Curated annotation (Swiss-Prot):
Cross-referenced PANTHER family: ENDONUCLEASE NUCS
GO molecular function, one term: DNA binding
Gene3D superfamilies: 2.70.180.20, 3.40.1350.10
Gene: nucS
Statement: the UniProt record of this protein carries the keyword Mitochondrion: no
Enzyme class at the top of the EC tree: hydrolase
Entry GO CC: cytoplasm
HAMAP family: NucS (MF_00722)
Protein name: Endonuclease NucS
Pfam families, sorted: NucS_C (PF01939), NucS_N (PF21003)
């Protein structure tokens, strides 16, 4: 993991074009090849990023760029598309690298882990014709609980929660934004699945085109014991 704090401007070129004017930002370079650009406020998600697989090249600035104060140019090129992230760095305030090793991954509580296993085994609960691709589909910003295909072969990303709230919807939204950049996956539809979904979360999800599914944990386990139900 490399962490660079720098004054820089950032341009994303590809299926979506976006530009961030010069400001002090955190540049995160991960071992999987992803590069993420963060600010110190506004949101906990990156302002822009390049998902793996990608290649980072550091270059000297052109004479015109140097005249404008640029000291180095980062070009992050996606390997599966023409998308690229261009970072023009004017000043590096900090540059640290750390070896983090292999991460064991997110450990869910017992019910959420069981819900994931059960839904993977009973994927038809999402609708007729759905098939499981895999559990814990890894992205540059974290694992999607379940990746599936619908009856038409479309990609479906499922976020599972014991109790579904707005944070869960925001999390799934970030995954969808990232995954829909991948031509091998897009278009990707989202499903927010939980034992109980708060009204505000349902409203936000539906506004963003995310389908909500309420799961009956006892029925999925083949249990119908009123005394042991959580809700």
């Amino acid at each position: 993991m490399r962490l660079v704090i720098a004054r820089c401007s950032v341009t994303y070129e590809g299926r979506l074009n976006a530009h961030l004017p010069t400001a002090t930002r955190l540049l995160m370079v991960k071992a999987d090849g992803s590069v993420l650009v963060h600010s110190d406020g506004g949101s906990y998600k990156p302002l822009n990023w390049m998902s793996p697989p990608a290649t980072l090249h550091v270059e000297e600035p052109s004479p015109d760029q140097a005249d404008q104060g640029v000291t180095q140019v980062w070009r992050v090129q996606a390997k599966k598309s023409d998308d690229r992230l261009i970072v023009l760095i004017e000043e590096v305030l900090a540059d640290d690298s750390h070896e983090l090793g292999v991460d064991p991954g997110l450990v869910k509580d017992g019910v959420e882990a069981d819900l994931q296993r059960l839904l993977a085994e009973q994927i038809s609960l999402l609708g007729d014709g759905h098939t499981l691709v895999r559990r814990e589909y890894m992205t540059a910003i974290g694992p999607v609980d379940i990746l599936a295909r619908d009856a038409d072969g479309g990609t479906v990303a499922v976020e599972l929660k014991r109790r579904g709230d707005i944070d869960g919807v925001e999390q799934l939204t970030r995954y969808l934004e990232l995954m829909n950049r991948d031509p091998l996956l897009a278009p990707v539809r989202g499903v927010f699945a939980a034992q109980q979904i708060k009204p505000q979360a349902r409203t936000l999800a539906e506004d963003r085109g995310i389908r909500c599914v309420t799961l009956d944990y006892d029925a999925m386990r083949g249990v119908d014991d009123a005394e042991s139900r959580l809700f």
